[in-house]
Each structure stands twice: as structure tokens, then as C-alpha cells.
């Protein structure tokens, strides 16, 4: 991935090898690898492709998965993945009741990966949740490993408070927990201004008198609660990493790509430069955006403009077509500020000689000459090389969440959702991936549940390529991916069956 430049600095705490690991390093649990097999998989020369065992391993929806280690840029495969079926059930004690005055305070206990509620078909008081995730680590695998173990727990915890609301799709979510929800068929949730000034309709103080609505209330759909739960879970996961890095060795940071299936809809949450696409009838439907210094230029520049102290008097928030030279002071040069999508000319000043906040193009673009992704988890100790300037204030843990309603379409066995880290997308276009999958799957036995794993393996092989005298090469003798590559192929037809 477009991660950390060599030589970037870490803080004095949270990065020492003397601290214990939060979780031991390993490959995804669902691969079922022994320690010896994990060691053998870390061959940077042969780069064996790991897949699910046909005999013993099966993921939900017959999901396919394959991965391969990098060509030597890091000792370990810094990608991580997890896939689980969980059961969302209201917490004992009534999480949906009116919260007490202390409910907004931070929890005293944090998720530890234990006690996740697995699917239980005998219980009708909750909702089944399907979960897939990919984490692309940089500057170490610590954050990616921790997130792969705990992020699903945070999502589950956020959903537990609202599970009863989500199950009752006929009624809009209440504005305040503990209130009787309004039925949109019988209550518009609005009053005229005159009626609101009179205090509403009905006898004051009467038990049947609804709460006074002074202005129109927003009608919040149920899927927005799920989106909010996922967004909150990402934030809580990042805060947990920040807290625990002082007592555990949680190295580096990671991007995060998560898919949650709940009540007939897929929620695709992305923070970083991994990517998700749906292939339906051969058509590509993008389900994520990449978050890089280029795509988030204006957000980063605006933050630096509003809080210039974050630049440490070493960087300028302005963008120029190239580095400004001292001999150009006083001349008019092209530039871009946070409020601009186009370019204009400005008179070069002394401050413009500072290194630009964002420098480089494409995969070489970096924030403060250090990191190539702008959203993800971790990186709390990341600093500009040989300085005390922290980069974390410019990085966001907030994901973009897109929703795909499976109930709107009838999907065939070759309609799939592809999730992959940037090791795949750096060398293959969306259309190339779609063409490969649509050509591969029809040649497999439609009754073979392993066909999606074989499709994932085929994609990894196409991106890795073959080792030749001039390195790893793919079709048309293009340079293959030397990065870690992880791929899910998720058949959508199983989502229709679940719904």
C-alpha cells in the first residue's frame, strides 16, 4: 500500500519492542494454518498463494478468499482479514431504555475479543450479522492484527443498543431512546407554527398528549442507524488502539475495509485505499472510494490553514506544481489552496519555500513526505522523520459507508462482491478484475462451493504474476504487484437466500 516512507519517526512510548503484543502475529484464523505453515507462507521468493482448504474450511455464503505475501518490502504479510457470523441481541438490562445521566461517559472496560455472540438460530430476539473485513497494515502489523480481532466487537456493541429499533422496520426510529416511536402512517411528526406556539393539541399534562414538536423533525431511516453504528465503531476502535498502545506493542497503523450484511442490506465501510466492487451481470458497481493525499487534498489543506501550528513551521499548506526555489521568490507561480479545484497564480513569498503538506502524484503522493493514506486506524505515534511533528491530526478514522440493497435485485451465481487490498488494485483495473471473474466462474462447476475461492486465487495470481529475470511480471509483461495481496470473492446469491 501507499504507506509509510522509510525513516519516519515514532514516539517514545507505545513503539518499544519491550512491550508485550496485544495479540500474537498470525494469518487469518479461518485459514487454519499451523505455526509451521505460517512460517512457510512467509517466503518472499516463492510467494505461495494461501487459500481456504477445500476439505475442512468454509466461510459464510461460500465466500472465497486468497492471499499472498509481499516480495520483500516487509518481513511479515501486514494484511489481516476476519470473517464471522455474529448475533446481535439487546444487552441484558435493557439497552433501549432511557439512559441514565452517566450513560455518555466512556466505558471502563474495552472489547478484548472474547465473548462475541455467535449466530444462534434458536433465539428470535436478535438479528444475524455477517461480517467480512480486510486490514492493510503499514509500519508494522500490530494495528492490523488488533483491528482484525476487535473491530467486529465494537460494531456488535454499537448495534446492541438499537437492535429492537432495527427489527421494527414499520416504525421510524424515535428521536430519543425511551420515547414512544411515531408511526409515519398516522403521525407526520410536525405541527404548524401557530399550533406549536400554543403548545400543541390536547389537554396539557394529559398522558395522551404527545411531546410538543416545535419544528419539523428529520425522518431518520433505519439504515442510517446502522451506518452511524459502524462509524462509531471505527472511532471507538481507533481510541482503543490509542489507549492500549501505552501498555502493548501495537505497531503502525492500517487501512480498514469492512462489509456488514444486516437485514437484507450490505454496508461497505472503507477507511484507506483498499477497494470494493460489485460485479453484477458483468457490470462493475464501485462500492468504495480511496482516501489518499490527492483525494483528500482540500480537507488536509483546510485543516492546516485553520491550525497552522500542526505544520511545525516546516511545511506549507499550499500546493504548487513543483518545489519552489529561492530564486523564484517574487515571481508569479501556479498554486492551489484549500478552496480551489482549479489553479491560479500567486506571488511567491518566503513561506512558500517550505516543504508542501502534500507532495507527489498518484501512489507516490505523501502527507508531510511520510504517509500515502489519509484514513485508517492507528498511527498515533507517527511523526515526520527527524522531527517532533505528529501526523495523526491529519489522519481520520472515519469510514465512508455505502449501502447496497440485496432485495432490489435477483442475483445469479456469478454476481459477486470483490474486496481486496491495494496490492490487487495497484496493477489491475476494475474492468480487468470484472473480466477475469466473469470469464472464470462460468467455467467452474456451479454446484462447487469452492469455486469462489478458486476465483480469488486466480485474481491474486493475476496480480502477483510470475517471477522472471526482471522481477514479478503479469500480462503484457507489465510489472506485477510486489505488495501483500488479499482478496475476498463474496457471492451475492447467498444474500438473497438469507433475506
Where are these regions (language model features)?
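PP2C/PPM-type serine/threonine phosphatase catalytic core
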Residues: 2-131, 137-499
Amino acid at each position: 500500500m501507499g504507506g509509510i516512507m522509510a525513516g519516519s519517526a515514532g514516539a517514545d512510548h507505545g513503539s518499544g519492542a519491550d512491550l508485550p503484543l496485544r495479540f500474537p502475529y498470525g494469518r487469518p484464523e479461518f485459514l487454519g494454518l499451523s505455526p509451521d505453515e505460517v512460517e512457510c507462507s512467509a517466503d518472499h521468493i516463492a510467494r505461495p498463494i494461501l487459500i481456504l482448504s477445500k476439505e475442512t474450511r468454509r466461510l459464510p455464503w461460500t465466500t472465497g478468499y486468497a492471499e499472498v505475501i509481499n516480495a520483500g518490502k516487509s518481513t511479515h504479510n501486514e494484511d489481516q482479514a476476519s470473517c464471522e457470523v455474529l448475533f446481535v441481541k439487546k444487552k441484558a438490562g435493557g439497552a433501549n431504555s432511557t439512559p441514565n445521566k452517566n450513560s455518555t461517559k466512556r466505558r471502563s472496560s474495552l472489547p478484548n475479543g472474547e465473548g462475541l455472540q455467535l449466530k444462534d438460530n434458536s433465539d428470535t430476539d436478535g438479528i444475524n450479522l455477517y461480517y467480512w473485513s480486510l486490514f492493510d497494515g503499514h509500519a508494522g502489523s500490530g494495528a492490523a492484527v488488533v483491528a482484525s480481532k476487535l473491530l467486529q466487537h465494537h460494531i456488535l456493541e454499537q448495534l446492541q443498543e438499537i437492535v429492537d429499533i432495527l427489527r421494527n422496520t414499520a416504525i421510524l426510529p424515535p428521536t430519543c431512546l425511551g420515547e414512544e416511536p411515531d408511526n409515519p402512517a398516522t403521525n407526520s411528526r410536525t405541527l404548524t407554527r401557530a399550533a406549536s406556539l400554543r403548545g400543541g393539541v390536547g389537554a396539557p399534562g394529559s398522558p395522551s398528549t404527545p411531546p410538543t414538536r416545535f419544528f419539523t423533525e428529520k425522518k431518520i431511516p433505519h439504515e442510517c442507524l446502522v451506518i452511524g453504528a459502524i462509524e462509531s465503531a471505527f472511532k471507538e476502535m481507533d481510541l482503543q488502539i490509542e489507549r492500549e498502545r501505552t501498555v502493548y506493542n501495537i505497531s503502525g497503523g492500517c487501512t480498514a475495509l469492512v462489509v456488514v450484511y444486516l437485514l437484507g442490506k450490505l454496508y461497505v465501510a472503507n477507511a484507506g485505499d483498499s477497494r470494493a466492487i460489485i460485479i453484477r451481470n458483468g457490470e462493475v458497481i464501485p462500492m468504495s472510494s480511496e482516501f489518499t493525499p490527492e483525494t483528500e487534498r482540500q480537507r488536509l489543506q483546510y485543516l492546516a490553514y485553520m491550525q497552522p501550528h500542526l505544520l511545525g513551521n516546516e511545511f506549507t499548506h499550499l500546493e504548487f506544481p513543483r518545489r519552489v526555489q529561492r530564486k523564484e521568490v517574487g515571481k508569479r507561480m501556479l498554486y492551489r489552496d484549500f478552496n480551489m479545484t482549479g489553479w491560479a497564480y500567486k506571488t511567491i513569498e518566503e513561506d512558500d519555500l517550505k516543504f508542501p503538506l502534500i507532495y507527489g502524484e498518484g501512489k507516490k503522493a505523501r502527507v508531510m513526505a511520510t504517509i500515502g493514506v489519509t484514513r485508517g486506524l492507528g498511527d498515533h505515534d507517527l511523526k515526520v522523520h527527524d522531527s517532533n511533528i505528529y501526523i495523526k491530526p491529519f489522519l481520520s478514522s472515519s469510514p465512508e459507508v455505502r449501502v447496497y440493497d440485496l432485495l432490489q435485485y435477483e442475483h445469479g451465481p456469478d454476481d459477486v462482491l470483490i474486496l481486496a487490498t491495494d496490492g490487487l488494485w495497484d496493477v489491475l483495473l476494475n474492468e480487468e478484475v470484472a473480466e477475469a471473474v466473469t470469464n472464470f466462474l462460468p467455467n467452474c462447476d456451479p454446484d462447487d462451493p469452492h469455486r469462489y475461492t478458486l476465483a480469488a486465487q486466480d485474481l491474486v495470481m493475476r496480480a502477483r504474476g510470475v517471477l522472471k529475470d526482471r522481477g514479478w511480471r503479469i500480462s503484457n509483461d507489465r510489472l506485477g504487484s510486489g505488495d501483500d495481496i488479499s482478496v475476498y470473492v463474496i457471492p451475492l446469491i447467498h444474500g438473497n437466500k438469507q433475506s
